[in-house]
């Protein structure tokens, strides 16, 4: 469930404030499960809607969904396996290059295939998160020069998802209203 609060989408708010769920791990897992449900709903969009930019000079829904999958893959393969190993985290790919490559691929790929690949990768992420021991959720990561706990890192990724979900939802709402 998504709640709009002063224009900001907050699904972790729903779990904590409305349902009384305090565990940030449950909030993260809930977020990812809800995000999969949302992505599935995009399968019914007409192709022209899928490929139309959400705003002038912005990405299309295809490009937005398409760029999320390689980042999930990165977290599954280049972040989570290094928890508790003491090894340095691998460098992140160049964000602009990865985003542009994935956006191009999404523009030229089948809509259902893009969505299903995203869902498969997000499901891998969920399964990987479920395997993390309780004590590791507060472990400090050092991506680059900053330090951040795993839970804060994952909450940041969820906020990134929600930013894009909001863009897509608002674009669809405006178009449905004829704006």
Which residue stretches match the model-derived regions?
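Short, contiguous alpha-helical
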Residues: 2-16, 51-97, 139-179
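Extreme N-terminal tail/first-helix region
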Residues: 2-33, 37
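Acidic/His metal-coordination segments adjacent to aromatic residues that form catalytic metal sites
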Residues: 20-22, 99-113, 143-152
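Hydrophobic packing residues in well-ordered alpha-helices of helical domains and bundles
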Residues: 24, 28-32, 80, 111-118, ...
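Alpha-helix N-cap/loop-to-helix boundary motif
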Residues: 27-30, 56-57, 68, 72, ...
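Acidic/histidine-rich alpha-helical segments that form the ligand environment
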Residues: 30-34, 41, 99-138
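Long, hydrophobic N-terminal alpha-helical segment
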Residues: 30-49, 54-56
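Structural signal for well-ordered, non-membrane alpha-helices
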Residues: 35-43, 73-80, 119-133, 162-165, ...
């Amino acid at each position: 469930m998504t709640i709009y609060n002063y224009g900001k989408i907050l699904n972790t708010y729903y779990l904590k404030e409305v349902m009384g769920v305090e565990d940030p791990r449950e909030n993260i897992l809930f977020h990812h499960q809800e995000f999969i449900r949302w992505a599935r709903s995009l399968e019914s969009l007409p192709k022209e809607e899928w490929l139309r930019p959400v705003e002038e000079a912005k990405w299309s829904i295809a490009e937005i969904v398409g760029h999320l999958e390689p980042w999930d893959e990165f977290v599954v393969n280049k972040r989570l396996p290094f928890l508790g190993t003491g090894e340095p985290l691998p460098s992140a790919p160049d964000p602009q290059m990865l985003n542009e490559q994935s956006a191009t691929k999404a523009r030229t790929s089948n809509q259902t295939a893009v969505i299903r690949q995203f869902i498969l990768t997000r499901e891998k992420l969920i399964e990987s998160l479920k395997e993390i021991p309780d004590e590791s959720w507060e472990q400090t990561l050092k991506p680059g020069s900053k330090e951040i706990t795993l839970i804060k890192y994952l909450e940041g990724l969820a906020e990134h998802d929600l930013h894009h979900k909001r863009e897509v939802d608002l674009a669809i709402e405006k178009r449905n209203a004829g704006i």
